[in-house]
């Protein structure tokens, strides 16, 4: 940024994920009191250096393993400096409403403003939850809580394609999982989870379990690079591959995916809100 410059102003949050990884690594556990103090000190240093708040991305490992108390503690540090809590919530589909409630409660506990990134209801089964999610935010604002949100102006969301895999496979980190993905048994296990299990942010199911509705924005893989912008189903067809084999190769390459999970009506409804 300093070398190239930008035509707009830029501000920076300090990521909860980065802080957690520095202190705990990628493990699935709670920090000890001493470790939590170390995490708070890192947040404090970032705020003193000019950060505008603490941000979280709670669908991705290792942040997905964090409990609300841990996040509130870091957001509270941001509040001490007049900063806010900015969150990519824990769930945007089956447990959307619980995730909104969690974000609002973290803000109350930390005594800091809340900003929700990419407010959405992902998956057709969850589209009806958007009015209630908006109502929760409006009620919080009416009570005096400072809450805002931003919204995608389109119906595809964006994420690293590895996020389609259950978070439990990432406890040793992304690189460790990639090294194991050549194992057909592991691939079959992951496929079965994606096709049949709930209780987690299952983006494959949010996209209707349809590879035609998952566009690859950037493959980061020399074999597939010329098909950036096409659906995974189309890329697999062009290569004469089973879509699941293409999927796992794209995970190994670190592809960025654009699943079609949202409704046009919800998009318009969200954009019309005053927050």
Across the structure, where does each feature detected by a protein language model lie?
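Divalent metal-binding pocket/active-site signature
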Residues: 45, 51-103
